[in-house]
A protein has these predicted regions:
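Walker A (P-loop) phosphate-binding loop of ABC-type ATPase nucleotide-binding domains
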Residues: 39-43
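Conserved ABC transporter NBD signature motif
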Residues: 60-70, 74
Length: 294
């Protein structure tokens, strides 16, 4: 997937257009697993719509496997699980797969798709009787029926419980092992941290970061020191090193570039106990990057 200088604007009731995306550029190689992150309104869904050919850029270009998005869709080179798009509740899972299978030039066997999506046991169940997680697996099965090289997943685990999310990502790992390119948007940062090889972060329609999750966590070069305190509240002016402090009752969370010096001081000169030092999580990096660019 090659996205070059892409911007997308929409008309609004006011005189000013809404700029959903502004000069976005990146490339995704075959076989990569990429997590697309961003706050609400960051432009994630708009970007997916552009890659799928559901809308066109105001400026810039997008190519998919060397073709236009429309050509890639016609050749069944892209499969997608989107937030929108209903299923027919009265049809069984098997009949749904058969109906959509007939629209592809070279579909995968329905039995193989059902096995990959873990639908074997519910093929004869009406879709309307399926749970939310089961319906999402049906959508995933429809996405891979055409044997695509690329999978786009827009909030694929929204509405799933923890067990259903775990099962879904186990299925995605198997898809990745087959060499498919997987691009997914999620608001579960833990999912992106665990599954994505690379993170693309959008904020207010602009590209804020494009790196491995480990690189994003190391973005600030700082560490987080957390501790509980008895008695006198912590006084930031007494600390031997600069730290950003968040206090809540007898608990303090401090971000600093010199965690060893800070920890030694806290343990020797304050009532601190249950002290921990950790690196930034992906969530910490996400909050820092979106806050600093607002």
């Amino acid at each position: 997937i090659d996205v070059s200088g892409v911007s997308k604007s929409f008309a609004s009731k006011s005189s000013r257009p809404i700029h959903a995306l502004s000069d976005i550029s990146f490339s995704i190689a075959q076989g990569e697993i990429v997590g697309l992150l961003g706050t609400n309104g960051a432009g994630k869904t708009t970007l997916f719509d552009l890659i799928l050919g559901l809308t066109t850029p105001t400026s810039g270009n997008i190519s998919v496997l060397g073709h236009t998005p429309h050509a890639a869709i016609r050749a069944a080179q892209i499969g997608a699980v989107l937030q929108t798009g209903g299923l027919l509740p009265e049809l069984t899972v098997q009949d749904t797969l058969k109906m959509i299978s007939s629209t592809f030039p070279h579909p995968l066997p329905i039995g193989e798709v059902a096995k990959q999506a873990d639908l074997d046991r519910i093929l004869h169940r009406p879709v309307g009787k399926c749970s939310g997680g089961e319906q999402q697996r049906v959508r995933f099965a429809l996405a891979i029926l055409g044997n695509p090289q690329i999978l786009l997943l827009d909030e694929p685990t929204a509405g799933m419980d923890a067990q259903a999310r775990h099962e879904f990502w186990s299925t995605m790992h198997r898809q990745a092992d087959q060499g498919r390119t997987i691009v997914f948007a999620t608001h579960y940062l833990e999912e992106a941290d665990n599954f994505a090889e690379r993170i693309i972060l959008l904020h207010e329609g602009k590209l804020r970061a494009d790196a491995k999750a480990t690189e994003l966590r190391e973005h600030s070069g700082k560490r987080i020191v957390e501790a509980k305190f008895d008695g006198t509240p912590l006084n930031a002016k007494e600390l031997p090193t600069v730290a950003e402090i968040s206090l809540s009752g007898g608990y303090a969370r401090m971000t600093t570039s010199d965690s060893d010096v800070l920890a030694k001081f806290l343990l020797n000169h304050t009532s601190a106990h249950d002290l921990t030092i950790r690196k930034h999580s992906l969530e910490d990096a996400f909050l820092a990057l979106t806050a600093s660019q607002s």
